[in-house]
């Protein structure tokens, strides 16, 4: 085991991580050996639910298909290509990201968060596109990898584009 720090969204800011290896991991019929893992230590306190374990098939070299309607994930070394409604290039550097445009001209990388409920931008991106903080903020309860982000708020009237996907006058 070795130790490192990670910066994430939330009250804690920098958080300790232990880098380790799982000797064996079984997921249904799939058996994996020597799986690299992160141990979040110390655990977060005063959060509404216990932190969940996470798995990244991409970090193990697998492709994946997520079917939300069937509540099913399929992953493997070689999957048949399925035609999607939209296709765009992914970048994988620790997190999976796609390139997007904010308010017509500002390029930004967005983390692909399959469990996310909103599209979010950073405060730096909001400043770069000239959006001022509204006088009256709609506070959000955002939970990041380092706990609650008490400064998060909803910013209305932002236009977003991801390849052929467009959202105009959208709250982020």
Task: Briefly describe each language-model feature range.
Residues 1-172:
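Pepsin/retropepsin-fold aspartyl endopeptidases
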């Amino acid at each position: 085991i070795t130790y490192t720090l990670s910066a994430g969204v939330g009250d804690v800011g920098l958080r300790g991580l232990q880098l380790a290896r799982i000797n064996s991991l079984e997921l249904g019929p799939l058996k994996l050996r020597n799986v690299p893992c992160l141990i979040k230590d110390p655990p977060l306190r005063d959060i509404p639910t216990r932190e969940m374990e996470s798995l990244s098939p991409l970090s193990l070299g697998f492709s994946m298909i997520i079917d939300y309607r069937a509540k099913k994930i399929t992953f493997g070394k070689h999957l048949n290509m399925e035609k999607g409604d939209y296709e765009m290039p992914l970048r994988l550097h620790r997190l999976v990201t796609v390139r997007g445009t904010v308010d017509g001209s500002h390029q930004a990388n967005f983390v692909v968060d399959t469990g996310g409920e909103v599209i979010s931008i950073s405060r730096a991106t909001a400043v770069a596109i000239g959006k001022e903080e509204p006088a009256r903020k709609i506070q959000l309860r955002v939970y990041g990898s380092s706990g609650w982000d008490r400064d998060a708020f909803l910013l209305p009237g932002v236009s977003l584009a991801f390849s052929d996907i467009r959202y105009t006058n959208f709250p982020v």
